[in-house]
Each structure stands twice: as C-alpha cells, then as structure tokens.
Curated annotation (Swiss-Prot):
GO terms for biological process: D-glucose import; D-glucose transmembrane transport; dehydroascorbic acid transport; fructose transmembrane transport; galactose transmembrane transport. Facilitative hexose transporter that mediates the transport of glucose, fructose and galactose. Likely mediates the bidirectional transfer of glucose across the plasma membrane of hepatocytes and is responsible for uptake of glucose by the beta cells. InterPro entries: Glc_transpt_2, GLUT, MFS_dom, MFS_sugar_transport-like, MFS_trans_sf, Sugar/inositol_transpt, Sugar_transporter_CS. Belongs to the major facilitator superfamily. Sugar transporter (TC 2.A.1.1) family. Glucose transporter subfamily. The gene is SLC2A2. Keywords: Cell membrane, Glycoprotein, Membrane, Sugar transport, Transmembrane, Transmembrane helix, Transport. It comes from Gallus gallus (Chicken). It is found in: Cell membrane. Residues 39-110, 158-163, 221-229, 337-350, 401-413, 467-471 are extracellular. This is Solute carrier family 2, facilitated glucose transporter member 2. Residues 1-17, 132-136, 185-199, 251-315, 372-379, 435-445, 493-533 are cytoplasmic. D-glucose binds at Q205, Q326, Q327, N332, N361, E424, W432.
Length: 533
C-alpha cells in the first residue's frame, strides 16, 4: 500500500466511528443547551418566582429598550458565551407587595444560573477516577443518570417549590456536564484515527454551539419560552440524555483503554476492527504498545504528581493556559454588551440578532472542523487569538466614540461578529481536545480533570467579577481583554505545540525532549514550544 492509500485508509470514516463520536458529543450538546436555555425564559421564570414567594412584580422587562424605564444590568455568575446573551439581568425592583425583598429574587435567579457552573467545578475533579474505574463508555452511561434526574426536576418545577427544584436541577445537570466535558474528549480522542483526531475533536464545540442555538430558538415566546411551557423548555435536554444512554449501548469501548489500562489485547483488536472497518489495526496496536510501555514506566499519575513532576510540568502549564485563554478572552463581555449595541444600531428585536450571532457561531464552528486538520491546531489557535485582539480594539473604539458618531454602532456590530468568528476558529474548539492530545495514557485522565476544573472555575470567576470590571472601566473594559489576549497570544506562540498528525507518544516525547528516530523528529519540527521549554 503506497503513502497516499495509507493516508486515505487512515481518514476512512466507518459507521461505527461516526455513531460513537456522534453519541459521545451528545454530552456536549446537553452542555450547550444548558448554558443557553436559562436566558430566554428569564422574565417569565422571575415572574413565577415572584408569585411563588408572595411578591407581585410590576411590568418591568429584562431587556428594556426605553430610556425612561432603563434596565440596570448585572452579571449572572456562571455566564457562558457561545452565542448566548445570558449574563444580563434586570433587578427585580419595584414590587407592589414588599413581602419579599427584590434582592432575594435576584439571589434566587443568580443561583438558578450559577449552580450549573458550581456543579461542573465539583464533578470535574472526578473525571479521571470514574473514567479509569468504569471505562469510557460505561462511565458516560452512568453519568447520564445525573442529566436525566436534573432535567426531570426542572421539567416538573411547577409541581413544587420552583426555585428550589430549578436550582437543584441546574446543580445536578452541572455535575453531569462537568463529568461529560472530561469523558467525551477523552473517548473521542482515543477512538479517532490520528488523521481525523483534530476534525472529530472539533465536533465538541459544534455540539455546544448547536445546543445553545436550539435553546435560543425554542426559548422564543411563541414556542416554549412562555409562562405555560418554560418547565418543558428547561427539561428538554433530558431527551438528548435518554438518546445518548441507549446509543451508548451500541458503542465500542475505547481500544486504548482496553489495551493499555486493562491489558485486554483481543478485545482491543475487536474494538479497533469495529471502528476502522477493514483497515489493518496492527499499526495502531504497535503505537498502543509503545504507549503502554511508557505508561508502565510512569504508572498511574495522580493530580498531585501531575504538578510535582517536572516531566509533566510544561504540558500542564500549556493545558491550563489554553483553558484560561478560552474563558478570559472576553467572549462573555462581548455578549454582555451585544444586546445594547444591537438596540442602538436600530435592531427592533435584539433577541433575533443574538440568535443571528448564534447562527454565525454554528456556521464557523462547522468551518473549523475542516480547517483544523489542514491548518493545524497551533496555527488556528494563534490566528483566533490575534483576530479576537484586533476585534477587541475595534470594539473599544466603537464604544468610546458611539456617543459622538452614531455609525460607530455598526463598527461595534461588525466587531462582535468578527470576535465570535475568530473565537470559533481557534480558542473556542481547540482547548477541548488539545489537552487529551498533550498527554499519554498515564497522566491523561488527571490532566483532563485539572483542565476541566480550570475551565469551569474561570467560567465562574468571569461571571462573578465582570460586572465590577465593567463598572470600573466602562467602555474601556475591552482594553483589559485586549491585554489578556496579547499575553495569551505570546504564550501560545512560544509554548503551545503543534499536535496535528502526531501520535500521543510523539507529542509526549516532545515535552520530555526525548530523541525520537529521525523520521519522527522531522515530523516534530513544528513543536518549537515543547523543544524550547
């Protein structure tokens, strides 16, 4: 078989591989849906909370366009920003019956949003343990119970104390998503052939933005975002959980887990044959054997060892920084201002403009699926950060000069769309799967757990702190993010390796400065960051 034929064989998609990846990323679809769904029915849920708690809210809208009845906005902890305007909340002020403080209602709403991120933070540390203990497929099966339970509580919210049921349901769903955000990249990276690992890994982000977009559309008033149907809207993600549960029964276990962790050679070969079809599995078996030998020498790696061992230090720093750059890039801030900017630009229904941003979000995530294996992870990550930096500067100029030149609102609108586009090109999808690529089998579960916790924690911090930064800096708030983006760009240029087309062993070896055969070293020339570290 010549080189071209081998490459085509390595890029061959079988039905089992497609089913396995689709089933796994349903976990990220639920993640995206849960991020976006709480935003659309905000007004009706707040009103319901008010009735439940004995307060009668006056007519006051969460996204008020009138200057005489302006809305003061606060940031909701746990805000996420893939196409969602979640994060702006009208204080529940002005109640005819003051039996309940408006601050209490604000607190309950804040908890309804933020407990999702808290749940994710708590569970993310157990990803490595449950993934190794149960196996990748069985672990995803078991944690689906959390999603089903959480969505059931929210779907039945009107039948009990709604605020308690929603807060509990969001927390339990967050527990599921924290586990899923680690297990899914782990499984997808391990079942994907090297030539397709980047493209298939990008599907995580596509599932997230699709979930957000669908939740935004279904949350429109004339669909499910009304006083009668909002519990159904909140609990609808449980359908995806049920679908994933039954489809997982048809998916093969990760051959890498079977071979390296359990030593089940024949079962690993059977799993590979199901995933690869008629392709000869011996090349991948040989790669696994090398990785198994490395894993045997390093044994099981705990989170403490991950940080204390100089062997993993560079890879850990890179893994954490790509997660931090995703959350601290300013994407949340962009969507914090987007509704107001759309209004000032003359858009009559800002919610539809936000959905339009969600559509752009989804389209460019699809494009990134095809770009990631052609341009490489490192190149796209750098391009995305630089594009976001330029867009942040343009956004600052637009906001500062908006009061002097009305047409600057259009500059701001263009900057929003460009910011989102560049985010989806690199910093959006790449952190989710590059962490799994940076580590060999031994430290991979611990590394994914730490990176997942970092992502969730940064998500929560941004939600908690952004309002104070915005109040302090005003329209110059994006200067802060521009500086951060510059720091992230310089770090990525110096330290983030190219993982395109590399085996796990080759990537790990680059961080260890291990000398590989001449051919492998030629393939690793782009790993400048790992070699210079």
């Amino acid at each position: 078989m010549d080189g071209k034929s081998k490459m085509q064989a390595e890029k061959h998609l079988t039905g089992t591989l497609v089913l396995s990846v689709f089933t796994a990323v349903l976990g990220f679809f639920q993640y995206g849906y849960s991020l976006g769904v709480i935003n659309a029915p905000q007004k009706v849920i707040e009103a319901h909370y008010g009735r439940m708690l004995g307060a009668i809210p006056m007519v006051r809208h969460a996204t008020n366009t009138s200057r005489d009845n302006a809305t003061i906005t606060v940031t909701i902890p746990g805000t996420e920003a893939w196409g969602s305007s979640e994060g702006t909340l009208a204080p529940s002020a002005g109640f005819e019956d003051p039996t309940v403080s408006p601050h209490i209602l604000t607190m309950y709403w804040s908890l309804s949003v933020s407990m999702f991120a808290v749940g994710g933070m708590v569970s993310s540390f157990t990803v490595g343990w449950i993934g190794d203990r149960l196996g990748r497929v069985k672990a995803m099966l078991v944690v689906n119970v959390l999603s089903i339970a959480g969505n059931l509580l929210m779907g039945l919210a009107k039948m009990g104390p709604s605020h308690i049921l929603i807060i509990a349901g969001r927390a339990i769903t967050g527990l599921y998503c924290g586990l899923s955000s680690g297990l899914v990249p782990m499984y997808v990276s391990e079942v994907s052939p090297t030539a397709l690992r980047g493209a298939l890994g990008t599907l995580h982000q596509l599932a997230i933005v699709t979930g957000i977009l669908i939740s935004q559309v279904l949350g429109l008033d004339f669909l499910l975002g009304n006083d009668e149907l909002w519990p159904l809207l909140l609990g609808l993600s449980g359908v995806a959980a049920l679908l994933q549960f039954f489809l997982l029964l048809l998916c093969p276990e990760s051959p890498r887990y079977l071979y390296i962790k359990l030593g089940k050679v024949e079962e690993a070969k059977k799993s590979l044959k199901r995933l690869r079809g008629n392709c000869d599995p011996m090349k991948e078996i040989a790669e696994m054997e090398k990785e198994k030998q490395e894993a045997a020498s390093e044994k099981r790696v705990s989170i403490g060892q991950l940080f204390s061992s100089s062997k993993y230090r560079q890879a850990v720093i890179v893994a954490l920084m790509v997660q931090i750059s995703q959350q601290f890039s300013g994407i949340n801030a962009i969507f914090y201002y987007s509704t107001n900017i759309f209004q000032r630009a003359g858009v009559g229904q800002p919610v539809y403009a936000t959905i339009g941003v969600g559509v752009v979000n989804t389209v460019f995530t699809v494009i990134s699926v095809f770009l990631v294996e052609k341009a490489g992870r490192r190149s796209l990550f750098l391009a995305g950060l630089m594009g976001m930096l330029i867009s942040a500067v343009a956004m600052t100029v637009g906001l500062v000069l908006l009061s002097q030149f009305a047409w600057m609102s259009y500059v701001s609108m263009v900057a929003i769309f460009l910011f989102v586009i560049f985010f989806e090109v690199g910093p959006g999808p790449i952190p989710w799967f590059i962490v799994a690529e940076l580590f060999s089998q031994g430290p991979r579960p611990a590394a994914i757990a730490v990176a997942g916790f970092c992502n969730w924690a940064c998500n929560f911090i941004v939600g908690m702190c952004f309002q104070y930064i915005a109040d302090l800096c005003g329209p110059y708030v994006f200067v802060v993010f521009a500086v951060l983006l510059l720091v992230f760009f310089l770090f990525a240029y110096l330290k983030v390796p190219e993982t395109k087309g590399k085996s796990f062993e080759e990537i790990a070896a680059a961080f260890r400065r291990k000398k590989l055969p001449a051919k492998s070293m030629t393939e690793l020339e782009d790993l400048r960051g790992g070699e210079e570290a």
